[in-house]
Amino acid sequence: DEHVSEHHYEGGIKEFVHQLNIRRVAMHSEVIHVEGVREIELGDVSVELALQWSDAFSESIQCYTNIIRNKDGGTHMSGLRGALTRSVNKYAKDRKLLKGNTLSGEDVREGLTAIVSVKHPDPSFSSQTKDKLVSSEVTGIVDSIVYEKLGDFFEENPSIAKQIVEKGLLASKAREAARKA
């Protein structure tokens, strides 16, 4: 007995992220949208990402490969997480917003709602249920596209970038205080 749920949003995954955040207070009204393509031997791998930070304390990242939800994430999730942490830290360091330490991935992702969608000519999954993408080349592809495009977005939207850094700093301080308590 297989359960199928179908989503259709006029604005694509940007609108989907907006809907997922409807009960939260968004830190920035615009849903950040990033896309890019990289060529591999078998054809093109395209990456699309929509993300928005809110006042929530948890992160919510949904992963898709060729429109199929991968509930256990996979290599696209790894690429996204790495690029997010690096790009937020780079922006913060370049603007001298950090005092010494870098932000952890966990701190950067606090309050994040994101959807990462990969279209791949020949994806590999951990099982037939396609719950987890294991195509190793996808990590680097997602990482490079997200790092580059998110860096550009931060340069063009410094007030949003600063809010994201400040949210990460608050998360870091709270985590540190909890550790010492």
Predicted feature residues:
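GHKL-family ATPase ATP-binding module
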Residues: 1-181
